[in-house]
Amino acid sequence: MLGWRPDIAELKRLVRPNTKLICINNASNPIGTVLDADTLGQIAEIARSVGAYVLCDEVYLPLENTEAFMSMADVYEKAIVTNSVSKTYSTPAARVGWVVADEEISNRIRTYRDYTMICGGVFNDALATYVLEHKDKILERNRKIVFGNRDIAQAWIDTQHRVSWTAPQGVSTSFIQLDIPEDDEEFCKRLLVERGVLLVPGSRFELPCGVRLGYCASEDVLREGLRLLGKALAEFDR
C-alpha cells in the first residue's frame, strides 16, 4: 500500500493471463480512503488486459464529495459493483442491497438468488425503498455526524503520541495506527474487559499495526470511548 492506496505496479505483477477476478473496495474498509477516477481507470485497464472482472464493494459510499464519487460500474464494462443501505444510509436492519453488473452476470445472480432466497421480506423492501426515496435528508443528517465526529477524533489523536491515522474521507469507518508494545488482539481484548471499549484488531484485516475505530456513535459515547482508550494507552508510558 502507498498511503493506504493500492500499488498499481504490484497489481500488474500479480495479475496473470488466467486471472478471472480482481476484488477491491471503494471506499476502503477499514481505512476510509477513496480511490479516485484515475486509479480506478488503471485498475480497469489491468483487468481489461486479461479479460478479468473487477468486483468492487461500494457499500461505504463517501459522504464527502459524494457527487464526485466515481463508481467502478462507470469505468469498466466488466465491473461487478455491490452496495446496500446498511452503511452510508444507516439502515442495516433492512438487510437490503443491490448488484450492478452486465447482463450475463446479473442473470446468473438472479438465478442463484431464486434458489437461495426467492424473495426479500416485504417490510425490508419497503424500508429500503423509503430510505432511498428520502436519501438526501438521510445523507444530510449523516454528514453532520461523520464530519463532527471526525473532528472530535482528530482533536483526540492530536493529543496522543502513540496514535496516528489517515483521516477517513467522509467514510463512517476509520483505522488508527497504534505504537504500542502489545499484540493488537490482546490489547483489544483487554480494553473490552477492563474498560468496556470495543475495537476491531487490525490483524483481522491483515493490518496488525492498529485497530478499526467506528467513530460515528453519539458524541458523548465517542468522547467517553476515546477518553477510556487514552487512559489505556497512557499505561504504556508508566
What are the functions of these language-model segments?
Residues K12, P181-E182, E186-L199, F205-R238:
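PLP-dependent enzyme catalytic core of the Aspartate aminotransferase-like
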Residues A47, I157-D158, L191-L192:
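A generic structural signal for well-ordered alpha-helical segments
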Residues S49-V50, Q160, R195, F236:
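Helix C-cap/helix->beta junction micro-motif
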Residues H161-W165, V197-G202:
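A short linear hydrophobic-aromatic micro-motif
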Residues I22, N29, D57, A79, ...:
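Generic structural signal for small/hydrophobic residues in well-ordered secondary structure
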Residues R5-N18, P30-Y53, E58-T91:
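Active-site pre-lysine segment of PLP-dependent enzymes
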Residues T129, I145-Q154, W165-L178, C209:
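Conserved glycine-rich beta-strand-loop-beta hairpin in the small C-terminal domain of fold type I
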Residues E77-F147, Q154-W156, A232:
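Conserved core segment of the aminotransferase class I/II
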